[in-house]
């Protein structure tokens, strides 16, 4: 079990690095005019967020939670998702009000409560909570064939669901349902994903790149954030194959520090954009590399401090002191 846990943590570390680099490239290329940056971003977009949900579906122990009460399940999700969301949002409100002077405290609190988020990437936490709520129904009623068919229906439904201005709840629901679909994919394919040789990894990479290229060429947008699903089949392929590619690589990387990064993915997800809100943008590759290093340094400090002084606020348990 420890080996598998490390593999998942390694995969999450690679994925969060892609998320950070993708956001840096967005700042470096706001007009989407620098083609190499656009291509890298499109490739990442094809699978990075689906992969997080897919990995969560792989790791959620249905047998364990069927033996426990509904209350225990949701208390766990509140501790690991809702509490970190509020914590990261409060950090953002304080930072953006007192340091950047870009929002009022009232506007910041309103954005947090209505789930509009003061940090763009914080949308992931409410979406994961909603996806886990849907997933709990599957845990209680584990009929794989029926739920597999239901996921296809959900994808088609999301494809025809057009976001309406002023109806933010619609986008929230979209994210939760789409996240649930990829959690289901992770659960249904966990045995296949447990055995990935180099041939399968290469095939997964090819299918991911091909799907991303088709979507880019035909301007087919698939986005958790925007609540748009123009090509359900391609997004399902790229999300699943991309996650397989990353997971296959992760299983072949023995570095302990990479697993440590993966264990602190939520902290990095919830705070790294504050650095980007602070510094002026630039399109230079040197700037991109420099900002990535800067964020890595800042996040190392943030991760250490949060783990040391307030682990409960980032969804972790406080370690008991050892007197051995």
Give the ranges of each region predicted by the language model.
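Alpha-helical transmembrane segments and their immediate juxtamembrane cytosolic regions
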Residues: 1-324
């Amino acid at each position: 079990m420890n080996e598998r846990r490390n593999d998942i943590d390694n995969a999450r570390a690679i994925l969060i690095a892609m998320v950070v680099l993708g956001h840096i490239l967005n700042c470096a290329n706001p007009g989407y005019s620098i083609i190499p940056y656009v291509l890298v971003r499109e490739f990442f977009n094809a699978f990075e967020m689906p992969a997080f949900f897919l990995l969560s579906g792989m790791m959620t122990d249905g047998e364990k939670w069927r033996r426990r009460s509904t209350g225990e399940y949701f208390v766990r999700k509140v501790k690991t998702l809702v509490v970190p969301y509020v914590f990261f949002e409060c950090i953002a409100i304080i930072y953006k009000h007192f340091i950047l002077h870009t929002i009022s405290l009232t506007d910041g609190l309103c954005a947090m409560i209505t789930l509009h988020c003061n940090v763009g990437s914080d949308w992931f936490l409410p979406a994961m909570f909603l996806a886990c709520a849907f997933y709990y129904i599957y845990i209680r009623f584990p009929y794989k064939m029926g739920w597999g068919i239901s996921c296809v229906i959900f994808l088609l439904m999301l494809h025809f669901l057009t976001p309406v201005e002023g109806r933010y709840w619609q986008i929230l629901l979209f994210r939760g349902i789409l996240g649930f679909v990829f959690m289901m994919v992770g659960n249904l394919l966990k045995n296949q994903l447990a055995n990935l040789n180099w041939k399968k990894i290469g095939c997964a990479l090819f299918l991911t790149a091909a799907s991303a290229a088709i979507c880019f060429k035909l301007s087919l947008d698939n986005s958790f954030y925007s609540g748009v699903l123009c090509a359900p089949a391609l997004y399902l392929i790229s999300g699943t194959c991309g996650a397989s590619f990353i997971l296959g690589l992760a299983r072949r990387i023995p570095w302990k520090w990479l697993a440590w990064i993966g264990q602190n993915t939520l902290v990095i997800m919830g705070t790294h954009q504050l650095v980007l809100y602070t510094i002026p943008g630039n399109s230079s590759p040197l700037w991109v590399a420099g900002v990535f290093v800067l964020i890595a340094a800042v996040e190392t400090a943030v991760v250490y401090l949060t783990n040391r002084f307030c682990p409960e606020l980032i969804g972790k348990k406080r370690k008991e002191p050892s007197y051995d």
